[in-house]
Amino acid sequence: MSIDADPTRRFPPGAKMEMALQASTSSPNRVRQVGAVLVASDGTQIAACNTFPAGVEDNEERHAGDGRFVWMEHAERHAIFEAARRGVATAGAHVTTTFFPCIDCARAIVDSGVACLDTPAPAFDDPVWGRSFERSQVILREGGVVIRIVDAGDAAPDGERGD
């Protein structure tokens, strides 16, 4: 198996956004539901959402205040970790996500060998994630990940979103 030298060729922009949007609807996060799809070089597709790690209890206390930041895994890392659990190689993979990656997810995307990322534009004015997006954009670019900006709303039928 070889890694495609042009990771953008395999998927037109937004090809997996509908799948990522569908995955986001499974998120227990009460503030923001995020979905991600990782497509490995061998064609394996892994859809994930921001959620509690496997076996970790979902209870009220863990949703309170900043609890979701402590207890929940982000969709991008959830997809990467699921690939690792299944023994799916991520070198040269393509990731589509419904929300621009944070710093931690950007590092995971780079270090797992993801080659291309389809994502909505970063909301630099977001009060929680804006500053993180500035840094994650640098990490992704310097890490060699091709970033393609996709409007998540365009993928949903009739312009409706699942979050």
Predicted regions and their residues:
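Zinc-dependent deaminase catalytic domain
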Residues: 1-163
